[in-house]
């Protein structure tokens, strides 16, 4: 299939060219054939976005012999990578994600972008076509938005968190440039000092927006797995 990705003012389409499965041992299979469609000058951005310079096979091999559960999880999720996404987009997206399903999160983020983001023409595709995209809104674009307006976008109780975070980011109290330079522990403490960001959301931002791969977000599903596969077995 083919998938579309928007980050900042950039647009990418990524496509699996064929089902090129390769069996590397008794339990592991790989599919590595894919193609990017983007502007040539943006290729390095997307290579970093998809973390293509990291050896994920080495990560998997480091746990394979010690942990049969993670071995099977790695097989099931073969090809998954930790994306280098925009920190501001991740802050709002994971605040929105609280108590929401993935389709509802996508719907809310798209509504926010349509109403407050900037339209932009980007990405030369096949046949020299250009794609018109709507970028995720910046802090300054959202700084004056009211809680009532956000509630109308079905953001519920999260609206009050978003209002405060946008004001903090636009006013400089939430310093995104400084956040990008922080280590994991410092970034966690800094993020949790802001209204609406707790332990799990801060870990999600650190992992997917700041690429601190030591971050470990624990939601209901992860907690169930930990209890079932690890804590209970130790007793």
Which positions does each model-derived feature cover?
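HhH-family (HhH-GPD) DNA N-glycosylase catalytic core used in base-excision repair
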Residues: 1-235
């Amino acid at each position: 299939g083919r998938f579309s990705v928007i980050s900042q003012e950039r647009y990418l389409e990524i496509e699996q060219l064929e089902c090129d499965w390769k069996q590397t041992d008794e339990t592991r299979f790989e599919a590595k054939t894919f193609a990017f469609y983007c502007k040539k000058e943006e290729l390095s951005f997307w290579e970093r976005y998809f973390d293509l310079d990291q050896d994920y096979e080495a990560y998997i091999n480091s746990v394979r012999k010690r942990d049969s559960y993670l071995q099977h999880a790695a097989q099931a999720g073969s090809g998954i990578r930790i994306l280098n996404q925009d920190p501001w987009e991740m802050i709002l997206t994971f605040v929105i994600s609280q108590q929401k399903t993935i389709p509802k999160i996508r719907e809310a983020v798209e509504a926010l972008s349509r109403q407050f983001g900037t339209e932009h023409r980007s990405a030369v595709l096949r046949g020299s076509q250009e794609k018109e995209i709507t970028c995720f809104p910046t802090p300054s674009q959202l700084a004056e938005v009211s809680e009532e307006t956000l509630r109308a976008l079905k953001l519920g109780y999260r609206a009050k968190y978003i209002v405060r975070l946008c004001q903090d980011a636009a006013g400089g109290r939430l310093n995104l440039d400084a956040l990008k330079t922080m280590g994991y522990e410092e970034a966690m403490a800094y993020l949790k000092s802001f209204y609406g960001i707790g332990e799990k959301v801060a870990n999600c931002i650190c992992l997917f927006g700041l690429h601190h791969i030591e971050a470990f977000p624990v939601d209901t599903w992860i907690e169930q797995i930990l209890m079932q596969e690890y804590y209970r077995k130790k007793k």
